[in-house]
UniProtKB/Swiss-Prot annotation:
Keywords: FAD, Flavoprotein, Oxidoreductase. This is Pyranose 2-oxidase. It catalyses: D-glucose + O2 = 2-dehydro-D-glucose + H2O2. Binds 1 FAD covalently per subunit. The gene is p2ox.
Length: 564
């Protein structure tokens, strides 16, 4: 059962935390039933389930970033300007992604004027310290593409919304009963508003999917990519992409729900008399630099696969598996221009006659038979045992088409490969900082312990990656020719933003951080959420899987509180 703190205990708690609380300010104490760190789709899954399934339970949610949309947690791509010009959305994504660990770089510039200041060439004379860089990060072990999005809604403000069902080989370590987890995945599908039919009427969708279905073996299972998206009924040219707001529903209207922004969750405070209980969360208001305390009965951390273990580490909650068993997907990418034969077939296909005729009537000089507002393709080639990678054939923000190619005939190919699970693949954190400011190798720019990656791909990973690249070039050649400047390439490690395993769930407290309900081992009232909870190597997008785990975790929170 949850413990309840008296005023005397609260005062004692404040006094014991005095070393962390801002001494020159009056401490602020907030009281709630459930405290949630983070505001992405996983945090919102917890909030939604708890509010919907209780009558009096209060939820207090803290987000380190700001609210950048008038709608709490909305997907930025719902903006008309980005639906009209997808390629411009890349600037939003790049602006939202903050690198996690930047390894030192060679600062020698041979063409710099001698009169200009430059750091010493001899390291013995001192080294340049660049704010935000991590001197402890070995470049060869880094995930340089890995980043954090600090905003209300998290990465769901700019994600692709792909929500495939994981293959059985992507859930071999799942401690949840298969039948139960299948049901959780279906519930996650509903919560994320996943559809597989919103692009069925698109000319490009039809011709790309049919070309692949007719050319590849049927065992590849070419199909429509399941997406968290719904076409608008008032104007079908546009769609509504799923964001954290979709998951949250009407929760923001509830007087039992509080969201604070630009507030860092510094650490959790464990009871001195009962080490299985967290009694409070220490927060830092980043606008005022004042510290605050949230006293609750249950606590949930859902701040991403790196920031969640970061907070646990800073709280001196350090299970052996914390940050270990890190798995990240490899990624290959290219863009193609559709074959002339595919494009020419559109003009003569009776299924498209009405659309083509209307387009030609309106734009008689256009040599392409594809209407300007025709939706992009959204095709998936799912993971199979023979081809253990996940494939998306579509058009998204990354990849600059440029002025010489019409985006209507450009298609992106993204292949995602899994990695072997290795305990030594991990993220570690700097020592507990005494000062809440940036310190090279000690803290990140938000004053939390600096993450450092130690990740290698195995030889087996390399073999799979090579096969995956070969498969991508084969698929590309089926569809068309490479767009100049966007040839087949491996993307920077970490760019997939699909890290798993850092707070993995399981039954053994030595090889996992939390139990099958995502409750941290040896704690009664502390839960974790997010892709880090996934104990498997995955190739498909992990969000739907993480939401499924979060639904089970939220049920456990409600059960723990003993409310209905």
């Amino acid at each position: 059962m949850p413990i309840r703190l008296s005023k005397e205990k609260i005062n004692d708690l404040l006094q014991r935390s005095q070393g962390d609380l801002t001494s020159s300010q009056d401490e602020i104490v907030h009281y709630t039933d459930v405290f949630i760190a983070g505001s992405g789709p996983i945090a919102c899954t917890y909030a939604r389930h708890i509010i919907d399934n209780t009558s009096t339970t209060k939820v207090y949610m803290a987000e380190i970033g700001s609210q950048d949309n008038p709608v709490i947690g909305a997907h930025h791509r719902n903006s008309i300007k980005f639906q009209k010009d997808t390629d411009k959305f890349v600037n939003i994504i790049n602006g939202a992604l903050q690198p996690i660990s930047i390894s030192p770089s060679d600062t020698y510039q041979p063409t710099l004027a001698v009169a200009a200041w430059a750091p010493p060439i001899d390291p013995a004379e001192g080294q340049l310290v660049i704010m935000g860089h991590n001197p402890n990060q070995e470049a060869g072990l880094n995930l340089p593409g890995s980043a954090v999005t600090r905003t209300v809604g998290g990465m769901a403000t700019h994600w692709t919304c792909a929500c495939p069902t994981p293959h059985d080989e992507e859930r071999v370590n799942n401690p949840v009963d298969k039948q139960e987890f299948d049901a959780l995945l279906e519930r996650a599908k509903t919560l994320l508003n996943v559809h597989s039919d919103q692009y069925d009427d698109s000319i490009r969708q039809i011709v790309v999917k049919e070309t692949l279905q007719q050319t590849l073996d049927a065992s590849r299972g070419v199909t429509t990519l399941p997406l968290g998206v719904e076409r608008r009924t008032d104007n079908p040219i546009y769609v509504t992409w799923t964001g954290a707001d979709t998951v949250l529903g009407d929760v923001p209207k509830s007087p039992r729900f509080v969201l604070v922004t630009e507030t860092r969750v510094t650490k959790f405070i464990v009871s001195e008399t009962n080490p299985t209980q967290v009694v409070a969360a220490l927060l830092r208001n980043l606008n005022t630099s004042n510290d605050e305390l949230v006293v609750a009965q249950s606590f949930v951390i859902a701040c991403g696969a790196v920031c969640t273990p970061q907070i646990l580490w800073n709280s001196n909650i350090r299970p052996h598996a914390l940050g270990r068993y890190l798995s990240e997907q490899s990624m290959t990418f290219c863009q193609i221009v559709l074959k002339r034969s595919i494009v020419d077939s559109i003009a003569t296909d009776p299924r498209f006659a009405a659309k083509v005729e209307a387009h030609k009537k309106k734009h008689p000089d256009d040599v392409l038979p594809i209407p300007f507002h025709e939706p992009e393709p959204q095709v998936m080639i799912p993971y199979t045992s023979d081809f253990p990678w996940h494939v998306q054939v579509h058009r998204y923000a990354f990849g600059d088409v440029g002025p010489k190619a019409d985006p209507r005939v450009v298609v992106d190919l993204r292949f995602f490969g899994k990695s072997d699970i290795v305990e030594e693949n991990r993220v570690t954190f700097g020592p507990n900082p005494k000062l809440r400011d940036w310190e090279a190798g000690v803290t990140d720019t938000y004053g939390m312990p600096q993450p450092t990656f130690h990740v290698k791909r195995t030889n087996a990973d390399g073999d799979r990656d090579q096969r995956m690249m070969n498969d991508m070039t084969n698929v590309a050649n089926i569809l068309g020719g490479y767009l100049p400047g966007s040839y087949p390439q491996f993307m920077a490690p970490g760019l997939a933003q699909h890290i798993t395993g850092t707070t993995r769930i399981g039954t053994d407290d030595q090889t996992s951080v939390a139990d099958p309900t995502s409750k941290v081992h040896n704690f009664d009232n502390l839960w974790v959420g997010g892709n880090g909870c996934i104990p498997d190597a995955t190739a498909c997008n992990p969000t739907r899987t993480s939401v499924a785990y979060a639904l089970k975790g939220a049920e456990a929170v409600v059960s723990y509180l003993g409310v209905s």
